[in-house]
């Protein structure tokens, strides 16, 4: 696949069909978007995983898998976490075959690379560092170290849900478009930490090649988060419902 000159990036949908539809509508309204790419963590969550899969399969976007795709498929062998297990039980064998065929990384031409976490590990944040004291933004040196020998003009990642762009010393631009589906969560590994973007808006990014290199614009989209939260509540996840409404982790 050739590298596009202007494209949208989405990530971490987590089965939130309402947010995804709003983001895709916004992207369609924008001029000269050649493609939309999807950076993984697609279905796991207590909202509408099957309908989300149906929509994305029909669109046939360039898509990679995230850690939650692995975890969802692992539910065939043993019960998984609540979000993965719910998505596994709601989806069909056809949906899961689609997930299983997704690549871990995907190049767009010679100068753009799609990854979920780092290019080597879908569970490791690329642009954040987790310590015993919590989560902080990673330094340029930390980002470069996690990339190892991988270099492109533009590298896209997801996983952390935090919209951010970092320019490295060698000119590489690393972009996280943020999360379409959920703006706050807590995690236990490698140390307990939390992420909270502070508003419920769905996030995506637009990357554009110019005469002096790549530029990025980050976007926030309002959608019917009340409906998404009601669905999560109905599926027994008041924790998700609260986060969907606020973009924060407190009750």
Predicted regions and their residues:
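Core catalytic region of metal-dependent phosphoesterases/phosphodiesterases
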Residues: 3-100
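Redox-cofactor binding/interface segments in oxidoreductases and associated redox assembly factors
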Residues: 38, 157, 176
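A short acidic, glycine-rich active-site loop
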Residues: 85-90, 132-141, 194-197
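Structural motif
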Residues: 35, 62, 112, 154, ...
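Acidic, His/Gly-rich catalytic cores of divalent-metal-dependent hydrolytic chemistry
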Residues: 2, 167-251
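Active-site environment of divalent metal-dependent phosphoester hydrolases
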Residues: 14-18, 44-47, 68-74, 107, ...
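Active-site-proximal beta-strand elements of phosphoester/diester hydrolases
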Residues: 5-14, 111-120, 174-177
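His/acidic metal-ligating clusters that form di-metal
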Residues: 30-32, 94-166
């Amino acid at each position: 696949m050739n590298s596009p000159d202007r494209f949208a990036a989405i990530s971490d949908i987590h089965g939130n069909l309402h947010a995804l539809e709003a983001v895709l509508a916004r992207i369609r309204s924008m001029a000269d978007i050649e493609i939309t790419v999807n950076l993984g963590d697609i279905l796991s969550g207590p909202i509408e995983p099957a309908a989300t899969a149906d929509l994305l399969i029909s669109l046939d976007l360039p898509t990679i898998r995230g850690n939650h795709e692995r975890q969802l498929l692992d539910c065939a062998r043993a019960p998984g976490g609540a979000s993965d297990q719910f998505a596994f039980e709601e989806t069909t064998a056809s949906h899961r075959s689609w997930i299983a065929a997704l690549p871990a990384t995907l190049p767009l031409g010679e100068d753009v690379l799609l990854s979920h976490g780092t290019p080597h590990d879908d569970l490791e944040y690329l642009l954040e560092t987790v310590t015993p004291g919590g989560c902080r933004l990673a330094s340029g040196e930390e980002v470069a170290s996690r990339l190892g020998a991988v270099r492109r003009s533009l590298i896209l990642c997801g996983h952390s849900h935090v919209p951010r762009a970092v320019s490295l010393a060698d000119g590489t631009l690393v972009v996280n478009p943020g999360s379409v589906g959920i703006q706050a969560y807590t995690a236990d590994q490698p140390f307990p930490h939390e992420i909270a973007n502070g508003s419920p808006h769905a996030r995506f990014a637009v990357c554009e090649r110019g005469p002096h290199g790549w530029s990025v614009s980050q976007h926030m989209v309002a959608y019917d988060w009340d409906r998404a939260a009601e669905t999560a509540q109905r599926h027994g996840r008041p924790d998700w419902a609260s986060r969907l409404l606020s973009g924060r982790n407190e009750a």
